[in-house]
């Protein structure tokens, strides 16, 4: 068989030529002398057509019939080398198809669990490693890739240097109650919830820096917008004002959206995303509204028949329904600026002349997607930062390096962070954040954690001593024994289902 191996997204350059594609059979149909193969290879999906007379003409009656029968018997997710002539096809969304001239099976696939019918979410998450192969899941990961690519491209063009912060940390960047703790050779350490504090040191050395990597939040939020492990881009910069920071954030988000439109148009089409809406978000300026003005606006409209948020007072933090209403009211991504200091991080710089408010901003995405960026100017005055830490009862010895940044040539500086999964969810137009990351880790009900995570762990650990109990009986017993510090974090991938905290199961 010919081995001019190309990928599906390259076929447009080989019209009229014979090529070979390594792919998986996503679906198959046909009858009689025709077999229609839906192929995928990670770059795209498209159709290959096998016609029996063509096989007989090339290989003879017996061998050609055998080849065609192989094509007709192909099962879902069988891997193949398919050789054929590339042809344009205006009827196809992809625009091309392959007239098959030869076919070779690489790896067979029998009884593939995710058939082309509807499946429940729990089933799909239990089979996440296979669900990733489906057309929509491939499209979401292609959009994720385009966003990551555009991130590096944007910061390179804007003079930022990639600066890697540690994942294990001895201090908290934000709320210490949202940290995963771990033992570090007898010392208490945390899984990073943000690289920001270290990035500030980088900004004092390099001017403009950004980081991109996994972060962890021990939030027990069971919403479509929360994960306990996700990927975050943090940026930090010296000598920029608050308004300049907002300009940079707006340009960044628009660059991400444009990057997806340019690099993954087929993915957007697969997901039936409203591309005109995305283009409008690029073309129109983002709205900027002060926190207090947003509260007043919410109060004025809370009696409207189309609102579904609870009453909110000045000084309260927004809930998801408030954020949704605000962004939908303006119809474009909206910065809410100058929140109360009472529920924001200790390092945020107060608004000049108004110490009750801080120079910060959350960017709220329209269409109900809520906050996608959080940023602020950092307190650059040593005495003011120490006073704030004392007010909050913080142990300054844990932040000596951070305070040093204010002692040796401090400058105005700020930064922002964006959870990549929230951005992917927004741009892709999907309903739940768990689809925006290959293997999501999120809070799950205790029952599902015990049954889907702990039971396989028990049976694999104690396989030489089989338990004469059902899963339900084991689950019932463990309810009385489960450790107090258990953080019930569920995940779709069995290997990572053992939790982040040290824990023990004690058997009576």
From Swiss-Prot:
GO molecular function, one term: ATP binding
PROSITE patterns documented for this protein: AA_TRNA_LIGASE_II (PS50862)
Keyword presence, Magnesium: no
Annotated compartments: Cytoplasm
Keywords for this protein: Aminoacyl-tRNA synthetase, ATP-binding, Cytoplasm, Ligase, Nucleotide-binding, Protein biosynthesis
GO BP annotation list: asparaginyl-tRNA aminoacylation
CDD domains, sorted: AsnRS_cyto_like_N, AsxRS_core
Pfam families for this protein: tRNA-synt_2, tRNA_anti-codon
Catalysed transformations (reactions): tRNA(Asn) + L-asparagine + ATP = L-asparaginyl-tRNA(Asn) + AMP + diphosphate + H(+)
First-listed, main subcellular location of the protein, grouped into a coarse class: cytoplasm
GO cellular component: cytoplasm
Highest rank taxon of the organism: Bacteria
EC number: 6.1.1.22
HAMAP family per record: Asn_tRNA_synth
Family: Belongs to the class-II aminoacyl-tRNA synthetase family.
Subunit: Homodimer.
Protein name according to UniProt: Asparagine--tRNA ligase
Species the sequence originates in: Streptococcus suis (strain 05ZYH33)
